Amino acid sequence: MRKAAFLQFALSQDPNFREDRTILSKPLPWCMFNPHQILEEGTWHWRFRSVDKAGKGTAWSQNYSFTVTNDIPQIVTPPYATFARNLPKGYPRLYCFMEEGLKKAPATIRSHPESKELVHRANMALETEFETSPEPYKVAGKMGQMTNFLYTAYRSTNDQIYADKMLAYVRALLASTPNKMLTNDFYCGDVLFLFTHTYDACYNQLTAGEREQIEESIFQIARYHHNIQRKGTEENHIFDNHYWQRAFREMLQVGLMFADRKETASEMLEYCYELWTARAPASGFIRDGEWHNGRISSFLRLHSWCYELVIR
């Protein structure tokens, strides 16, 4: 389908694609295009072509068409540029839609009915000694799983002991050599969680050198299962539970963490935004809460997160 680095799409109610009646995308590195606007009722025609890095396009494909009727539910997300302008600039940023509540949490968290369990899980993580392993990367997946508890407790209570444990995990990995397990998608995801969430919560407690090492490690790991935006896989794949359950969230978080400083991360984030926009209406979850590609938790968070950003 794609014969060069990019695809360009044309969408129009005119079968001849008259310029003044056609929505023309920029050349895109993925196999999808969202117009980000309500489409008028009637027949719409679309076509695509490949475009090389020099901007030279191939001949247009055959014409395809679909019909918009008045009974089709409408959902429109803003263009990615609007979304990107509203991204958080500082750290922490992963759960920016919760920041106002998290500022108040340390004073009230102890009275919350789930506080006891939250602290219990984090204290269980404190009792681990994974960072003392002679080969810490062999237990890095377990570190990532424990970081879920530590991050939640630290952001909720502001108790430094939880941050110290995350930092100990990360520093043990930074001082060691990655092993071959980093090609496994579950393992990669757990290690990415450890790195992104420690970077997020402890940004000012890390040295500039440590932050640089973490960033380098993240993108080394991401190349296996998360830096996939140019592969044309998920936008063309009908059913991929595993990607939507885990890898999408992890890819989104890597993009969010580094989009303002690294082009690859910005591209990853834009891909996630466009992929979610393209697939959400087909799922029906925007109407009934269901997601036919697996668990919906990360999508509900993303929906809330996008909404918070774009309405500011």
Q: Where are the predicted features?
A:
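Solvent-exposed loop/turn segments flanking beta-strands in beta-repeat/beta-sandwich domains
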Residues: 1-21
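Short strand-edge motifs at loop-to-beta-strand transitions and within beta-strands
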Residues: 31-34, 64
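Extracellular fibronectin type III
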Residues: 51-72
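Aromatic-lined, polymer-binding surfaces characteristic
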Residues: 94-95, 116-123, 127-312
